[in-house]
Amino acid sequence: MARILELGCSIVISYKDGYIHPDMKRLFYRNKQLAKDFQKCALPLLGACLFWGIGFTSYSSFMGHLGVDAAAANSVAAVVRDIICCFSAGISSAAGIMVGNELGAGNLRRGKLYGIRLLKISLVCGVMASLLMLVTAPIILHFVNLTPQAAGYLKGMFGVIAFYMIGRSVNDVTINGIFGAGGDTMFDMYSLAVCMWCLAIPLAALGTYYFHWPVVVVYACTCIDEVGKLPWVFLHFRKYKWVKDLTH
């Protein structure tokens, strides 16, 4: 229902002055070149979304296998993590608009400078989100109604999230915002295939079903992909393959 209302509001607002609104006459018009360019950028994003969605679902199954207390703690941790991630998600959207606008206007040098500055901002945002997690953790633990065992798991998970947020912030802004603005969408799919499906999921699965690691250690394995891909992200960023004008 929320998404339907959001779509309706977006369509209504799009007909106001200064906005681009749907043109029903051209809605089903097919431009072969535009479709080709769109598929080149969109298909890797579709693959990345599939990798990410299925991967996160498997994380929940690991926690569920570890018991009721682990599943309960993971549910609370997921909500808190998603709320804090709103900071990086907002900056990511802004980064895509700012960098994409400059690159599309042909201002490649300015777009590159914006990308560098936004990367630095994402680092600061990640550190702030990490500190926010550490500060609010005792307050959240005070208000949630969990068993002592689940509360202990949740406390450890909050510590993991504090480190996780630094990687998540940088990756959100850089991969989803800056790289996406320049059409460099293949990196997102590759990084998820390697760091999530070849690292995080196998480690978490082994820890859950074979080695029987502690709950917090398995949870840390499910978060290792965001931190593990950081060196790769920085290296790819400095290649500046994303500095290109997609309108030509």
Which sequence ranges carry the predicted segments?
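Short alpha-helical transmembrane segments in multi-pass integral membrane proteins
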Residues: 1-43, 99-165, 206-248
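Hydrophobic/aromatic residues within the transmembrane alpha-helices of Major Facilitator Superfamily
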Residues: 8, 50-54, 83, 87, ...
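Hydrophobic/aromatic residues in alpha-helical transmembrane segments
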Residues: 10, 55, 59, 95, ...
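Core transmembrane alpha-helical segments of multi-pass membrane transporters/permeases
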Residues: 33-62, 90, 94, 123-126
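Helix-terminus/linker motif at the lipid-water interface of multi-pass membrane proteins
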Residues: 46, 50-83, 101-102, 141-148, ...
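Small-residue-rich hydrophobic transmembrane alpha-helices
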Residues: 60, 73-137, 169-191
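Alpha-helical transmembrane segments of multi-pass membrane proteins
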Residues: 80-84, 148-174, 194
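C-terminal structured "cap/appendage" subdomains that terminate the fold
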Residues: 178, 186-198, 205-213, 217-220
